[in-house]
């Protein structure tokens, strides 16, 4: 068990993670359009892994590497956790990009992807991870809020949406895998292994689908990187969204109920909309504003201790009886 102050710190780390992911949405979109989705995911992951190598050395030198593996079993657990996280991350991000490429609208893609906040507690039941009533109530409210925020009122379902929904399933697995391994190993080290795994696994599909597996195809693919905007997007996504964001996720999830963690990270949708307002001078509609308010309310409700709510209910009943 970790202390309450540590839980608050880790919750704030997950909110910061959502903020980084939300703001990085524009960079990810531009980078994927410039060099191809598979290339973008592969390169950003490898960059993130490289960036974390000196970070690990620095943390060890400063004495913050508290879970540096000593025994062979600890190293095995670290490598296993990193590889499992990397495979789940690769499959989830690839499924999401394929769904968007097949035609899922960005708003619907955001909603379907964020449905992992509903899937995590459901899958967690099979792993004997119980959730209190407040958490379930918060999940339902958050899903409604996400619908208002991301959807335009259409409820049609296309084939591409199935791929995006698969992405939500895979991200649920990713969150639960992190929940299992994060208390056992050093989060930064596991994140580093995760990114190298994701990047290396992504090389083959990148070569087949983006490069065209021919000399001329590779030459044409290389010319895409002459665009400075492409590199800016890749570097930002690699360093911030991946290197910083996913590492904060692994560190922040330690000791946090995975369902609550998924709800905190679903703030990515809210921050992406707010970033559009601040950076791109867009405007929030009434529908989007209601969605943001519902998501924030859901997160607050999910954090309330069940005992506190019961006590409040008892006090209310006593007050009514006195009247």
Predicted regions and their residues:
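Glycine-/small-residue-enriched transmembrane alpha-helix faces in small-molecule transporters
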Residues: 1-43, 91, 95, 155-180, ...
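Hydrophobic alpha-helical transmembrane segments of multi-pass integral membrane proteins
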Residues: 8-13, 39-58, 136-141, 159-163, ...
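Specific alpha-helical transmembrane segments that line the substrate/conduction pathway
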Residues: 39-50, 97-130, 167, 258-277
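Specific transmembrane alpha-helical segments of multi-pass solute transporters/efflux pumps
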Residues: 24, 56-112, 146-148, 237-256
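Transmembrane alpha-helices of multi-pass small-molecule transport proteins
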Residues: 34-91, 117-123, 170-177, 192-213, ...
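C-terminal-most transmembrane helix of multi-pass membrane proteins
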Residues: 45-46, 53-57, 230-232, 266-323
């Amino acid at each position: 068990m970790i202390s309450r102050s540590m839980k608050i710190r880790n919750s704030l780390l997950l909110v910061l993670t959502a903020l980084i992911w939300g703001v990085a949405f524009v960079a990810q979109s531009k980078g994927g359009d410039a060099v191809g989705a598979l290339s973008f995911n592969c390169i950003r992951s490898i960059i993130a892994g490289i960036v974390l190598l000196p970070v690990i050395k620095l943390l060890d030198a400063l004495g913050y590497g508290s879970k540096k593996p000593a025994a062979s079993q600890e190293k095995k657990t670290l490598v296993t956790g990193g590889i499992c996280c990397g495979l789940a991350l690769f499959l989830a991000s690839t499924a999401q990009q394929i769904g968007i490429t097949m035609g899922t609208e960005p708003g619907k893609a955001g909603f379907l992807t964020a449905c992992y906040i509903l899937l995590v507690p459901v899958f967690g039941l099979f792993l004997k991870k119980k959730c209190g009533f407040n958490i379930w109530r918060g999940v339902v409210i958050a899903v409604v809020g996400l619908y208002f925020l991301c959807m335009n009122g259409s409820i049609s379902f296309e084939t591409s949406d199935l791929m995006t929904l698969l992405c939500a399933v895979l991200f649920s697995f990713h969150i639960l895998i992190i929940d299992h391994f994060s208390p056992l190993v050093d989060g930064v080290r596991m994140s580093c292994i995760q990114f190298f795994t994701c990047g290396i696994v992504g090389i083959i599909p990148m070569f087949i689908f983006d490069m065209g597996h021919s000399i001329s195809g590779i030459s044409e693919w290389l010319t895409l990187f002459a665009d400075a905007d492409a590199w800016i997007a890749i570097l930002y996504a690699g360093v911030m969204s991946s290197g910083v964001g996913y590492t904060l996720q692994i560190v922040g999830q330690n000791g946090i109920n995975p369902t609550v963690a998924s709800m905190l990270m679903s703030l990515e949708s809210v921050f992406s909309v707010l970033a559009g307002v601040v950076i791109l001078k867009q405007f929030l509609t009434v529908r989007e504003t209601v969605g943001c308010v519902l998501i924030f309310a859901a997160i607050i409700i999910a954090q309330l201790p069940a005992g506190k709510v019961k006590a409040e209910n008892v006090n209310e009943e006593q007050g009514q009886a006195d009247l």
